[in-house]
Every structure is written in C-alpha cells, then in structure tokens.
Curated annotation (Swiss-Prot):
The keyword Oxidoreductase does not apply. Keywords: Cytoplasm, Developmental protein, Phosphoprotein. The gene is Mturn. This is Maturin. One of its GO terms (biological process) is positive regulation of JNK cascade. The modification Phosphotyrosine is found at Y34. It is found in: Cytoplasm. Promotes megakaryocyte differentiation by enhancing ERK and JNK signaling as well as up-regulating RUNX1 and FLI1 expression. Represses NF-kappa-B transcriptional activity by inhibiting phosphorylation of RELA at 'Ser- 536'. May be involved in early neuronal development. Residues 107-131 are annotated as: Disordered. Residues 107-120 have a biased composition (Acidic residues).
C-alpha cells in the first residue's frame, strides 16, 4: 500500500477516535497523531517491498509506557494492517484519554444482561414423572 493510501486509512481511523493526524511525512513514512490531553504518538510505516512491520513510538515520557501493548502486538507473528495497529494503540491509550477500558465495557454489558434476566419459572424436569 502506498503512503497516501495509508494516510487515508489513518484519517478515516481518526474520524472515529479522539486522535487527529497532525503530520504525515511521506519521505520518512511517518505519521504523527495527537489527542487531548497531550496524548501523542507516531507510526513508522514499512516500505511496500520491504518485509518490515509498523513501528509505534512516542516522544512523550508519559505516553511511552502505554504503548507497550501495541508494540508487543506489532512484534508478534503475522502481518498487521495499519488499522489493526492504530486500534491496538487506541486501546492502549484509553486510560490516558479518560475512557473506560474496552474489555470493561464488554463485561459490564454482559453483566447488565444477566442482571436483567427474569427468574425462570419452575419447569418439570425431563424424565421425572410428577404424580
């Protein structure tokens, strides 16, 4: 995928997150992202013919520890798309952005569903005769 296509993917991703693509350097194949309150990171994109993977980093010491999850994900087996990498970065930064953890949301929804169930009526068990 050429760099402009990657930048388009990044712009589309930004439209559904608090992040903004603040710089896209084609010569360096680098994209810089920013979100309030001071959360920033950049992605280095691999060349088309190169087997390299994406690389994420932050020049902010406050942000850098949160990128470990995304960095581990990128270095794991298999090719990753830019969208997959950005989603993992977003998940990593949720606490810094003041958002609930994505996994917590799923658990709360599941718990809420369980709590809303009405008690089941007593049904006769199969194979047990009632006399």
């Amino acid at each position: 995928m050429d760099f402009q296509q990657l930048a388009d993917v990044a712009e589309k991703w930004c439209s559904s997150t608090p992040f903004e693509l603040i710089a896209a350097e084609e010569t360096e194949r680098r994209m810089d992202f920013y979100a309030d309150p001071g959360v920033s990171f950049y992605v280095l994109c691999p060349d088309n013919g190169c087997g390299d993977s994406f690389h994420v980093w932050s020049e902010s010491e406050d942000c850098l520890p949160f990128l470990q999850l995304a960095q581990d994900y990128i270095s794991s087996c298999g090719k990753k798309t830019l969208h997959e990498v950005l989603e993992k970065v977003f998940k990593s930064f949720r606490p810094l952005l003041g958002l609930p953890d994505a996994d917590d949301d799923a658990f709360e929804e599941y718990s809420a569903d369980v709590e809303e169930e009405e008690p089941e009526a007593d049904h006769p068990q199969m194979g047990v005769s009632q006399q």
